[in-house]
A protein has these predicted regions:
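Conserved subregion of the PPM/PP2C metallophosphatase catalytic domain
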Residues: 1-38, 44-50, 61-212
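Short Gly/aromatic-enriched secondary-structure transition segments
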Residues: 54-55
């Protein structure tokens, strides 16, 4: 269980391609004023060059996490011009407004899962726009969604097979959900990474993200 001052409880599961020493799929959870930034970077291909590109992307995100999401993607793009590039999805969760704004370049899947007041399961999917951060950016578009307590956010690289979205239980613990997705849907031909985060609502002025 997350601590009482946690606004976001998250967990990750991942693996490099067999035979590789490191993965090109990396993540970041970064504190921002009034919330958190959650990102997954998938370096093109696998191995050292993919990992190098993703490390640069995560470093660029961390250094300029205060920027608006389109500007943050552009900053990462400039930082990666001499690399093979990355696919990148980012979500900014605001505990003041109780909203999530997200953006995607490439094929890192994003899913927001909730049970509404009528008991119906709802799924919102990030719009994945064709492009490569570091090579070619598409027109950058954000989408903003209202957050509700216990909403579940899932990011997954393309090392996870399509269709994993229907295998996520809204009441699952983040670590259990991440492990299940990787185990049941991870490909043997690529790096893979899953991040699952539960929105716990606005706790207090010093709310933080907690990995569990």
């Amino acid at each position: 269980m997350a601590s009482d001052d946690s606004v976001l409880e998250y967990a990750v599961a991942g693996k490099p391609l067999r035979g590789e020493l490191e993965s090109g799929d990396l993540y970041a959870v970064i504190a921002r004023p009034h919330g958190s930034l959650v990102a997954i970077s998938d370096g093109l291909g696998h191995g050292y060059e993919a990992a190098f590109a993703s490390k640069l992307a995560i470093n660029a995100l961390t250094a300029q996490a205060h920027l608006a999401l389109p500007d943050l993607v552009k900053h990462c793009h400039q930082s990666l011009l001499r690399t093979r590039g990355v696919a990148l999805s980012i979500a900014s969760l605001d505990c003041e407004e109780e909203t999530m704004t997200w953006i995607s370049v490439g094929n890192v899947a994003g899913l927001l899962l909730r049970v509404n007041d009528a008991g119906t399961l709802e799924r919102e999917h990030i719009v994945m726009r064709s492009g490569v951060v570091g090579h070619r950016l598409p027109p950058l578009r954000i989408a903003t969604l209202r957050l509700h307590r216990d909403d579940l956010l899932v990011f997954a690289t393309d090392g996870i097979r399509e269709g994993f979205q229907t295998d996520v239980r809204p009441d699952a613990r983040p670590q259990d959900a991440a492990d299940r997705i990787l185990s049941r849907h991870g490909k043997s031909t690529d790096d893979a990474l899953v991040l699952v985060a539960r929105w716990r609502g606005r706790a207090n002025a010093n709310a933080v993200a907690t990995r569990r």
